[in-house]
UniProtKB/Swiss-Prot annotation:
Name of the protein in its database record: Phospho-N-acetylmuramoyl-pentapeptide-transferase
Entry keywords, A to Z: Cell cycle, Cell division, Cell membrane, Cell shape, Cell wall biogenesis/degradation, Magnesium, Membrane, Metal-binding, Peptidoglycan synthesis, Transferase, Transmembrane, Transmembrane helix
EC category name: transferase
Transmembrane residue ranges: 9-29, 55-75, 79-99, 115-135, 155-175, 196-216, 253-273, 312-332
Family: Belongs to the glycosyltransferase 4 family. MraY subfamily.
An MF annotation (GO) of this entry: UDP-N-acetylmuramoyl-L-alanyl-D-glutamyl-meso-2,6-diaminopimelyl-D-alanyl-D-alanine:undecaprenyl-phosphate transferase activity
Location of the protein in the cell: Cell membrane
Amino acid sequence: MILEHKQMIYTIIIGFFITLILGPLIIPFLKKLKVGQTVREEGPRSHLQKTGTPTIGGLIIIASVLVTSFTAGLINQDLWVAIGAMVAFGLIGFIDDFIKVVLKRSLGLRAYQKMSLQIIVAVFLAIYQSNISVMGTKIIVPFVKGSLTLGSFTIPQYLDLGILYIPFIVFVVVATVNSVNLTDGLDGLASGVTLIVAAFFSILAMEWGYPSLAIFAAAVTGSCLGFLRFNSHPAQVFMGDTGSLALGGAISAVAILMNVALIVPIVGGIYFAEALSVILQVISFKLTGKRIFKMSPLHHHYELSGWAETKVVIVFWIVTVILCLIGMLGLN
C-alpha cells in the first residue's frame, strides 16, 4: 500500500506539472483564435472585466489527464471507460464552445441537442456497468452497514435497483455533468471544488482496490490543481463547457464504476446546491413572479450580497472538504 500511495502522489504531481507545461502552450493559441468569453450583462458588474478572457481551457485539463493516466502504467478496462466518459462529455462541451466562441453563434448547441448527447453517453456507461460489474444493478447506500430498518421499511447496504438501474444512473450522470457546468462561474471555483472531490475518489478507490481508477482520479486532481495556476482570480483562461462537462463526466464515471453513485450528491454537494438554486429560482419566478435568490446560480447570489469573488470560492472549497470528510465516514 505504501508503494501504491506513493504512485498516487506521483500521479498528482505529474498531472500538476504537465498542466503547468501545457498552459503556456495552449493559452496563447486560444488568444490568437480570439475565443474570448462573453459575460452576462445582467451579472455582477465586476465580471465585465472578464470579457474576452480565453475559454475552451478545458483542453488543457483533458490533455493533462490523458497523458498522466497513461504514464502511470495501470491501464485496464475501467480506466478506458473513465477516460472515454471524460473525453465524450468533453467533446460535447467542445462542440458547444466552438459554436459559441469560434462560429460566433451565441446559443451554441440547443438544449435538446446537448441533453440528447449527454443521455446517449450516460446510457452507454450505465449499460456497461450493469453488465460488467459483479454487483450488477446494485449500488452501495452510504451510512448503511448491513441494513437499516426504519419502521417497517428496511434499507439494505447493497440496494438492487433492477430495471430502474439504467434510468437512475443516467439521471445521476447527466445531473452531475450539468451541475459541474453551472458551478463553473467564478475564477477557480469548479476546478478547485473538483480537485477536492477527485482527491476523495482517488483515496477511496485506492482503499477499495481500484488502482486504475485511483490513478485516474489522482490525474484529475493534479490537473485541476495545475489549472488553478491559470484559472484562479484573476483568471488567464476559463475551462469552458469543454472542461466543466469533461470534469463532470470524469467524476460521475468513477462513482458509477465503483458503485457509489449515491455518494456524489454528498461529496459534490456544492455542484448540486448550484443546480438546485437555478431550479428553485426558475420555479419561484414562474409561479410567483418573485426570485428566491438575488441571482442564480448560488455563487452569484453571494457575490451580489457583498461577498468578494475569492471569498465565495474559498468558502465553497472549505464546504467541499467537509462534505468529502462526511462522505468518507459514510463509506467506511
